[in-house]
A protein has these predicted regions:
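Short alpha-helices
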Residues: 115-187
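An acidic intrinsically disordered interaction segment
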Residues: 1-6, 101-111, 133-141
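Glycine-rich, phosphate-binding/catalytic loops in enzymes
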Residues: 36-38, 103-106, 129, 186
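Short, motif-level signal for alpha-helix interfacial/capping segments enriched in acidic residues
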Residues: 2-7, 91-93, 148-151
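Hydrophobic helix-and-loop "lid/oligomerization" segment in the mid-to-C-terminal part
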Residues: 2-24, 30-64, 71, 76-85, ...
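Short acidic, glycine/serine/threonine-rich loops at helix termini
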Residues: 32, 61-64, 100, 122-125, ...
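Short hydrophobic "helix-edge" motifs at membrane interfaces and signal-peptide entry regions
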Residues: 17-18, 104, 160-162
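Active-site cofactor/cluster-binding pocket
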Residues: 67-127
């Protein structure tokens, strides 16, 4: 760890301009880790730019204090697309970067900080720290840069800590997922000691729903189907649902959270239509390795929670995914 820390700080110190980025469809771990790391990099005397796709990230506005430097990939001018250092968070594969992979490929040096198993299209980096034992990338950042964080001005330090606490909430589902271990609670307690208020962060992250968003969730839940001896839960949402309720689905929590814990369910499969013929798939399971399924479709994640995209009709997606999930369950059950 000491050698990793030293190399990380040295690469940042030598960089002229730094790119921060994460996987497609950024979540509370990848995106908020990037926000936190950008502020730490600024404290270390360097500037950086956080680049995402055109996703709606407004649900994280409560964290913002007006100091973050961010741009969407589509907004970058040609002269802004060259970086001396690219830092990729919560992702270790070019396949998971979308269009932004060209920015990373062109960078003079690359750092990868991730807690997923190594995937296809592995990014070749000067420094690659991929450690699945960590619950979230935020935990990796804190473990590497805790000393610097403790030296930051109070306001900036609190910003960093709130962002890092959000990475815990996102990837442990508020300390209930199987990846919640002793180290996670130690990490969280350190953040609380530095000023984080857990009740506030929980409320901001999980409880900010409009009536329209809840109607959308209700319509999604009404599509629930049970398959394979009631062990598989399948549900979906469509563009028509989001249009009817005048919401952007990206601005709310993944709908799988509303159905976790149903008795007898071993796998949750949720399809959300992003645009015509394109579905974002979320897979959850306490038994089978859903990451293996997601990887087949160019996605990835963790053993118990993974995602990918499907290009085709809802019927085609449902048919293929259910076959894959049933096959995985049959193999698991022998």
């Amino acid at each position: 760890m000491q050698n990793i820390r030293k190399e990380l700080v040295e690469l940042i110190a030598k960089a002229e301009n730094i790119l921060l980025t994460t996987h497609i469809s950024p979540d509370g771990d990848g995106y908020c880790s990037a926000l936190a790391l950008q502020r730490i990099i600024s404290f270390l005397g360097k500037s950086s730019l956080l680049v995402t796709d055109d996703d709606d990230l407004s649900r994280y506005n409560y964290l913002q204090d007006g100091k973050s430097q961010e741009k969407r990939f589509s907004e970058l001018k040609e002269e802004e697309q060259n970086f001396s250092l690219a830092i990729v968070l919560d992702c270790n594969s070019y396949d998971r970067l979308g269009e932004r992979c060209v920015l990373v490929e062109k960078a003079e040096k690359i750092i990868v900080l991730d807690h997923h198993e190594a995937e296809n299209g592995l990014i070749k980096a000067e420094l690659s720290y991929i450690e699945p034992s960590f619950a979230c990338v935020g935990e990796i950042i804190f473990s590497l840069l805790e000393t610097a964080i403790n030296k930051m001005p109070v306001s900036d330090r609190l910003f960093v800590c709130n962002c890092l606490y959000t990475t815990i909430l996102n990837d442990t589902n508020n300390f209930v997922n199987a990846n919640t271990d002793t180290d996670v609670f130690i990490f969280a307690s350190k953040l609380v000691n530095l000023g984080v208020k857990p009740n506030e962060q929980y409320r901001y992250f999980f409880l900010q729903h409009s009536a329209e968003e809840l109607r959308y969730i209700g319509e999604t839940l009404s599509t629930i189907e049970l398959h394979y001896q009631r062990k598989i839960l399948f549900m979906y949402s469509t563009l028509a649902m989001s249009k009817k309720n005048n919401i952007d689905p990206e601005s709310i929590m993944n709908a799988t959270r509303w159905v976790q814990g149903i008795i007898g369910i071993e796998v949750i499969t949720y399809l959300r239509e992003e645009k015509e013929g394109v579905y974002k798939i979320s897979l959850r399971s306490e038994t089978i390795d859903v990451n293996r399924i997601a990887v087949r479709y160019g996605g990835g994640g963790h053993k118990q929670a993974a995602g990918c995209y499907f290009y085709g009709t809802l019927a085609e997606a449902k048919d293929k995914l259910l076959k894959d999930v049933i096959n995985a369950l049959e193999c698991y059950n022998g």
